[in-house]
Amino acid sequence: MKKLIKFEKDNCKPCEMVSEYLNSKNVEFEAINAYNDPIRASKMKVRSVPTLMLLDNEGNEIRRIVGYNPQEIDLMIEELKGE
């Protein structure tokens, strides 16, 4: 099963906007604070936040979006729901 994860940090308006957008679309995602979990962020090569990643059922990255881009997020949601 594909999975959506979002790397974020506290007091980040674009991070909040991504979460609000995903919630408005009823999309489940895992939120990870990149500053509280720097090892995982580094392992996933996260360089800035928000970073939204779509992973396959083995944890391999399928797609990545950096920043707030509703059109790109919609494409990612379609791919997520397409299974």
Predicted regions and their residues:
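Non-catalytic, surface beta->alpha helical segment in thiol-disulfide oxidoreductase systems
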Residues: 56-83
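Local sequence-structure signature of Cys/Sec-based thiol-disulfide redox active-site neighborhoods
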Residues: 1-27
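Structural micro-motif
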Residues: 44-53
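Short acidic active-site motifs
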Residues: 36-41, 72
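Short amphipathic alpha-helix with an adjacent loop that forms part of the alpha/beta core around
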Residues: 41-45, 77-80
